[in-house]
Protein backbone atom coordinates (compact mmCIF):
# COMPACT_ATOMS: atom_id res chain seq x y z
CA UNK A 1 0.00 0.00 0.00
CA UNK A 2 1.28 3.49 -0.85
CA UNK A 3 2.36 5.96 1.81
CA UNK A 4 -0.50 8.47 2.22
CA UNK A 5 1.85 10.98 3.87
CA UNK A 6 4.01 11.36 0.73
CA UNK A 7 3.52 14.61 -1.22
CA UNK A 8 1.20 14.32 -4.17
CA UNK A 9 2.07 15.58 -7.66
CA UNK A 10 0.74 19.00 -8.67
CA UNK A 11 -2.95 19.27 -9.49
CA UNK A 12 -3.59 23.00 -9.72
CA UNK A 13 -3.82 25.67 -12.43
CA UNK A 14 -0.13 26.48 -12.84
CA UNK A 15 1.54 23.17 -13.73
CA UNK A 16 5.16 24.41 -13.94
CA UNK A 17 4.99 26.13 -10.55
CA UNK A 18 3.18 23.15 -9.06
CA UNK A 19 5.73 20.75 -10.52
CA UNK A 20 8.61 22.76 -9.06
CA UNK A 21 6.86 23.00 -5.70
CA UNK A 22 6.29 19.23 -5.72
CA UNK A 23 9.95 18.63 -6.57
CA UNK A 24 11.09 20.86 -3.71
CA UNK A 25 8.90 18.93 -1.24
CA UNK A 26 10.20 15.59 -2.51
CA UNK A 27 13.91 15.99 -3.13
CA UNK A 28 16.35 14.94 -1.93
CA UNK A 29 15.17 13.62 1.43
CA UNK A 30 12.13 11.58 0.31
CA UNK A 31 11.06 9.34 -2.52
CA UNK A 32 8.06 10.75 -4.38
CA UNK A 33 5.45 8.44 -5.79
CA UNK A 34 2.22 10.06 -6.99
CA UNK A 35 -0.96 8.38 -5.86
CA UNK A 36 -2.83 9.20 -9.09
CA UNK A 37 -2.19 10.71 -12.56
CA UNK A 38 -1.36 14.41 -12.64
CA UNK A 39 -4.32 16.49 -13.82
CA UNK A 40 -4.36 20.16 -14.77
CA UNK A 41 -6.94 22.35 -16.47
CA UNK A 42 -5.26 21.76 -19.83
CA UNK A 43 -3.72 18.31 -19.68
CA UNK A 44 -3.40 14.96 -17.97
CA UNK A 45 0.08 13.67 -17.23
CA UNK A 46 0.72 9.98 -16.63
CA UNK A 47 3.63 8.99 -14.42
CA UNK A 48 6.25 6.96 -16.28
CA UNK A 49 9.05 6.60 -13.75
CA UNK A 50 10.24 7.99 -10.43
CA UNK A 51 13.63 7.95 -8.80
CA UNK A 52 15.00 9.68 -5.75
CA UNK A 53 17.17 12.65 -6.64
CA UNK A 54 20.67 12.32 -5.19
CA UNK A 55 22.07 14.60 -2.56
CA UNK A 56 24.13 17.52 -3.79
CA UNK A 57 27.66 16.35 -4.70
CA UNK A 58 30.68 18.24 -3.35
CA UNK A 59 31.72 21.07 -5.66
CA UNK A 60 34.42 23.70 -5.71
CA UNK A 61 33.52 27.34 -6.21
CA UNK A 62 32.93 28.19 -9.91
CA UNK A 63 33.10 24.50 -10.84
CA UNK A 64 29.94 24.11 -12.94
CA UNK A 65 30.86 21.04 -15.00
CA UNK A 66 32.00 18.59 -12.33
CA UNK A 67 28.78 16.66 -11.71
CA UNK A 68 29.77 13.12 -10.82
CA UNK A 69 28.08 10.69 -13.23
CA UNK A 70 27.31 8.35 -10.32
CA UNK A 71 25.00 11.05 -8.91
CA UNK A 72 22.51 10.87 -11.79
CA UNK A 73 18.81 10.12 -11.68
CA UNK A 74 15.94 10.96 -13.98
CA UNK A 75 12.28 11.51 -13.25
CA UNK A 76 10.04 11.67 -16.28
CA UNK A 77 6.37 12.33 -16.86
CA UNK A 78 4.73 12.52 -20.26
CA UNK A 79 1.29 13.47 -21.53
CA UNK A 80 -0.45 10.86 -23.68
CA UNK A 81 -1.50 12.06 -27.13
CA UNK A 82 -5.24 12.25 -27.72
CA UNK A 83 -7.32 13.49 -30.65
CA UNK A 84 -9.08 16.08 -28.46
CA UNK A 85 -5.90 17.78 -27.22
CA UNK A 86 -2.33 17.79 -28.54
CA UNK A 87 0.39 16.16 -26.45
CA UNK A 88 2.30 18.40 -24.03
CA UNK A 89 5.35 16.37 -22.98
CA UNK A 90 6.97 17.11 -19.62
CA UNK A 91 10.33 15.91 -18.46
CA UNK A 92 11.89 16.40 -15.06
CA UNK A 93 15.61 15.63 -14.87
CA UNK A 94 17.73 16.11 -11.80
CA UNK A 95 21.47 15.79 -12.23
CA UNK A 96 23.32 16.47 -9.02
CA UNK A 97 21.76 19.65 -7.70
CA UNK A 98 20.36 20.98 -10.99
CA UNK A 99 16.66 20.72 -11.88
CA UNK A 100 15.54 20.95 -15.51
CA UNK A 101 11.87 21.15 -16.45
CA UNK A 102 11.01 20.95 -20.16
CA UNK A 103 7.65 21.33 -21.87
CA UNK A 104 6.19 22.13 -25.29
CA UNK A 105 3.41 24.71 -25.46
CA UNK A 106 0.29 24.32 -27.60
CA UNK A 107 1.84 26.48 -30.35
CA UNK A 108 4.90 24.20 -30.51
CA UNK A 109 7.29 26.42 -28.54
CA UNK A 110 9.76 24.45 -26.42
CA UNK A 111 10.17 25.83 -22.90
CA UNK A 112 13.06 24.72 -20.70
CA UNK A 113 13.57 25.91 -17.12
CA UNK A 114 16.84 25.12 -15.32
CA UNK A 115 17.34 25.63 -11.61
CA UNK A 116 20.53 25.05 -9.67
CA UNK A 117 19.81 24.29 -6.03
From Swiss-Prot:
Disulfide bonds: none
Extent of Low complexity compositional bias: 31-53
Location, primary (coarse class): host cell
UniProt-annotated location(s): Host cytoplasm; Host nucleus
Biased segments, Basic and acidic residues type: 60-71
Post-translational modification: Phosphorylated by host ERK. The phosphorylation triggers a structural change that enhances keratin binding and protein stability.
Keyword line: Early protein, Host cytoplasm, Host G2/M cell cycle arrest by virus, Host nucleus, Host-virus interaction, Modulation of host cell cycle by virus, Phosphoprotein
Coiled-coil region(s): none
Keyword Phosphoprotein applies: yes
Domain of life assignment: Viruses
Residue ranges, annotated region (Disordered): 31-89
Entry's family note: Belongs to the papillomaviridae E4 protein family.
Additional remarks: The major E4 form is first synthesized as an E1^E4 fusion protein from spliced E1^E4 transcripts, such that the first few amino acids of the E4 protein are derived from the N terminus of E1.
Protein function: Contributes to multiple aspects of the viral life cycle including viral genome amplification, suppression of suprabasal cell differentiation and egress of newly formed virions. Induces host cell cycle arrest at the G2 phase by associating with and preventing the nuclear entry of host CDK1/cyclin B1 complexes. Inhibits cellular DNA replication by preventing loading of host replication licensing proteins MCM2 and MCM7 onto chromatin. Within the cytoplasm, associates with host kinase SRPK1, a splicing factor regulator, and inhibits its activity.
Record text on subunit structure and interactions: Assembles into oligomeric complexes. Interacts with host CDK1. Interacts with host SRPK1; this interaction may favor expression of late viral transcripts. Interacts with host cytokeratin components KRT8 and KRT18.
Name the record gives this protein: Protein E4
Organism: Human papillomavirus 42
